[in-house]
Amino acid sequence: MINRTIMLGRLVSTPELKITQAGTSYVRVTIANEQVYKDKKHTNFIDVLAWSGLAENLSKYCDKGRKILVDGRLEVKKNTKGDKNYTNVTVIAENIDFLEAAKSSQTFEVIENAEDIF
């Protein structure tokens, strides 16, 4: 069976590296994936789980708002809490491409004469 998905979105929060009791590093993040249908925007919030080196790089190089492309597989878990049933879908990342950084509100001073610097 084939279980493959590719998701593009922005990180909802800054990734936080965690370690399992067995010593394996992981990061659990959510990405915001925007869709447009009939001129209406809708945002899906997709949970992503990354392990080991992939998790370490994600936490090291990415911040909230960073656009990433996640290539992985879907993991579906069904849970019951009280009398309600829940289905949780998570993308288990196999590869993550770090794309454009978050939109910055920083402004930079314009240098009119570069010779003044040297």
Annotate each PLM feature.
Residues 18-33, 87:
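Short aromatic-glycine-enriched beta-strand elements
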Residues 6, 12, 26, 43-45:
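Short coil/loop residues immediately preceding or within conserved phosphate-binding loops
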Residues 5-13, 31, 64-75, 93-96:
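OB-fold and OB-like beta-barrel modules that bind single-stranded nucleic acids
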Residues 51-86, 102:
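Beta-rich strand-turn-strand
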Residues 25, 42-44, 85-89:
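Residues on conserved beta-strands of the protein kinase catalytic domain
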Residues 14-16, 34-38, 53, 77-79, ...:
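Short coil/turn motifs at secondary-structure junctions
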